[in-house]
Amino acid sequence: MAEPDPSDPLETQAGKVQEAQDSDSDTEGGATGGEAEMDFLRNLFTQTLGLGSQKERLLDELTLEGVTRYMQSERCRKVICLVGAGISTSAGIPDFRSPSTGLYANLEKYHLPYPEAIFEISYFKKHPEPFFALAKELYPGQFKPTICHYFIRLLKEKGLLLRCYTQNIDTLERVAGLEPQDLVEAHGTFYTSHCVNTSCRKEYTMGWMKEKIFSEATPRCEQCQSVVKPDIVFFGENLPSRFFSCMQSDFSKVDLLIIMGTSLQVQPFASLISKAPLATPRLLINKEKTGQTDPFLGMMMGLGGGMDFDSKKAYRDVAWLGDCDQGCLALADLLGWKKELEDLVRREHANIDAQSGSQAPNPSTTISPGKSPPPAKEAARTKEKEEQQ
């Protein structure tokens, strides 16, 4: 067997672990020694995997008010938003997993072998018709951006938005005024389409695809007659390279994560919450708490990856539970941006109506003239959740 290399940090660390074990066995403080050994193992994991960082507390309290004061300070200059289907439901676009109203719960008419098949690339290549029938119902351009979308735009206008990472394929972030450089469309977009034939890959515009979908004709490549698919990421396909390149550059310098309308169940998007420095505060605006730490991994590796809202060690994670639009209004109110946000939504919706020739607003995105919900202290959040249920 090869001799240990003293220059190898893993060998050195392993030797120290053995020394700690030997020392512990000779003392009456075995419990204390065991704790020291666990601390050492945590350090070993974090150093070896490059996960170590200082757990500095930057929020003076773990509430929406605490997040607001931090956002108004000099420490908060770069905000990343991580968003999912929950920010678009008030525009009339269903999310995926809600038991009765979610997309997966309403696919019986397509006679699929299982709900997820409609977004599997292998099934799509053989049976594209169900996807395009669904796409007609959900096609971008039929919906208006929500208060959440315009709150993200307001972050951009205030010079605070570093990037918006979205799981959504509805392009409403673009409609709301975000530029391509502001976005990472992690699960792709309807903005462009390509032939699925790998030897062809001809590109098509959003307008071309829309015409095909609304004529109820399966889009076929004009060169090779293969199916043309919007550039959204199906199960079994890789995420866009931009997702990984931006992740590497963005998360080392982020000052605040705002996570909205996502179950944080789909990887690798869900793992983004663990990419920020351990001191970076994280605000969740959602109907329920998501993304919590696995207790065993948290103990063994000292990871700050999962969200920790309730333990005694919580120091940076805040949950505002309720409707995402109302959460954005509550935060905007505390920041002194509420009127500006409401005016922006009304003005942009009026412009969309004028361009489409329609004067009927989306009822679910119409702003109530009443006061926005109070900032979410735990008791208020719990009461709000119970009322919704």
Swiss-Prot record:
Residues 378-389 have a biased composition (Basic and acidic residues). The lineage of its organism: Eukaryota, Metazoa, Chordata, Craniata, Vertebrata. Residues 57-338 form the Deacetylase sirtuin-type domain. Induction: Up-regulated in response to caloric restriction in white and brown adipose tissues. Up-regulated during cold exposure and down-regulated in higher ambient temperature in brown adipose tissue. Up-regulated after beta-adrenergic agonist (isoproterenol) treatment in white adipose tissue (at protein level). Up-regulated in response to caloric restriction in adipose tissue and kidney. Up-regulated in response to oxidative stress. Up-regulated during postnatal sciatic nerve myelination development and axonal regeneration. Down-regulated during preadipocyte differentiation. The active site is at H187 (proton acceptor). It is an enzyme of class 2 (transferase). The modification N-acetylalanine is found at A2. Keywords: Acetylation, Autophagy, Cell cycle, Cell division, Cell membrane, Cell projection, Chromosome, Cytoplasm, Cytoskeleton, Differentiation, Meiosis, Membrane, Metal-binding, Microtubule, Mitosis, NAD, Neurogenesis, Nucleus, Phosphoprotein, Transcription, Transcription regulation, Transferase, Ubl conjugation, Zinc. Disruption phenotype: Tissue-specific knockout of SIRT2 in Schwann cells of early postnatal mice leads to a transient delay in myelination, a reduction in the nerve conduction velocity and hyperacetylation of PARD3. The number of dividing Schwann cells in the developing nerve and alpha-tubulin acetylation are normal. Mutant mice embryo grow normally and new born are healthy. Embryonic fibroblasts (MEFs) display reduced cell proliferation capacity, centrosome amplification and mitotic cell death. Nude mice inoculated with immortalized MEFs from mutant mice developed tumors. The keyword Metal-binding applies. Disulfide bonds: none annotated. NAD(+) binds at residues 85-89, 95-97, 167-170, 262-263, 286-288, 324. Its EC number is 2.3.1.286, 2.3.1.-. CDD domains: SIRT1 (cd01408). GO terms for biological process: autophagy; cell division; cellular response to caloric restriction; cellular response to epinephrine stimulus; cellular response to hypoxia; cellular response to oxidative stress; chromatin organization; epigenetic regulation of gene expression. Phosphorylated at phosphoserine and phosphothreonine. Phosphorylated at Ser-368 by a mitotic kinase CDK1/cyclin B at the G2/M transition; phosphorylation regulates the delay in cell-cycle progression. Phosphorylated at Ser-368 by a mitotic kinase G1/S-specific cyclin E/Cdk2 complex; phosphorylation inactivates SIRT2-mediated alpha-tubulin deacetylation and thereby negatively regulates cell adhesion, cell migration and neurite outgrowth during neuronal differentiation. Belongs to the sirtuin family. Class I subfamily. Binds 1 zinc ion per subunit. Isoform 1 is weakly expressed in the cortex at postnatal(P) days P1, P3 and P7, and increases progressively between P17 and older adult cortex. Isoform 1 is also expressed in heart, liver and skeletal muscle, weakly expressed in the striatum and spinal cord. Isoform 2 is not expressed in the cortex at P1, P3 and P7, and increases strongly and progressively between P17 and older adult cortex. Isoform 2 is also expressed in the heart, liver, striatum and spinal cord. Isoform 4 is weakly expressed in older adult cortex and spinal cords. Expressed in the cortex. This is NAD-dependent protein deacetylase sirtuin-2. The modification Phosphothreonine is found at T27. Interacts with CDC20, FOXO3 and FZR1. Associates with microtubule in primary cortical mature neurons. Homotrimer. Interacts (via both phosphorylated, unphosphorylated, active or inactive forms) with HDAC6; the interaction is necessary for the complex to interact with alpha-tubulin, suggesting that these proteins belong to a large complex that deacetylates the cytoskeleton. Interacts with FOXO1; the interaction is disrupted upon serum-starvation or oxidative stress, leading to increased level of acetylated FOXO1 and induction of autophagy. Residues 1-34, 350-389 are annotated as: Disordered. Inhibited by Sirtinol, A3 and M15 small molecules. Inhibited by nicotinamide. Inhibited by a macrocyclic peptide inhibitor S2iL5. Inhibited by EP300-induced acetylation. It catalyses: N(6)-acetyl-L-lysyl-[protein] + NAD(+) + H2O = 2''-O-acetyl-ADP-D-ribose + nicotinamide + L-lysyl-[protein]; N(6)-tetradecanoyl-L-lysyl-[protein] + NAD(+) + H2O = 2''-O-tetradecanoyl-ADP-D-ribose + nicotinamide + L-lysyl-[protein]; N(6)-hexadecanoyl-L-lysyl-[protein] + NAD(+) + H2O = 2''-O-hexadecanoyl-ADP-D-ribose + nicotinamide + L-lysyl-[protein]. Pfam families: SIR2. The gene is Sirt2. A motif (Nuclear export signal) lies at residues 41-51.
